[in-house]
């Protein structure tokens, strides 16, 4: 909770990193109001707000980045996976407040700048227009409605945004079910 974050925060806190929709261990989106309150707390305390969009970013949720649907403006956004259609590529975006620390030569890797991956990333970004993102939201709504229409007592809530959806399956399960 926001209260527990405030209670545990010491004077040496400089940033908060959050994954808006937990992708591993169950697909669990955070509440929009909680995320907005956390962003406000970060501004109040002068903490950086870092958003991990490795799984949620690049159109999967129906917007280029999920944070856009939460009504916040992070200081740093990390992204990967979807940016190059499965090829190894990732990156970060920063606001002006943080951009100055990334001077030439301070951010790099011995495995980075693969020309095939960067070409794939460019192709993905060229595809990522508003009609494409609208289709992601429409298809997500269609899937959600179809799953809910099944009406099975074993199927619980359908959660997520866009095409990043999860289904709560109720009842005990074995590896044969």
Language-model features and meaning:
Residues 1-177:
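Conserved N-terminal phosphate-binding loop of PLP-dependent enzymes in the Aspartate aminotransferase
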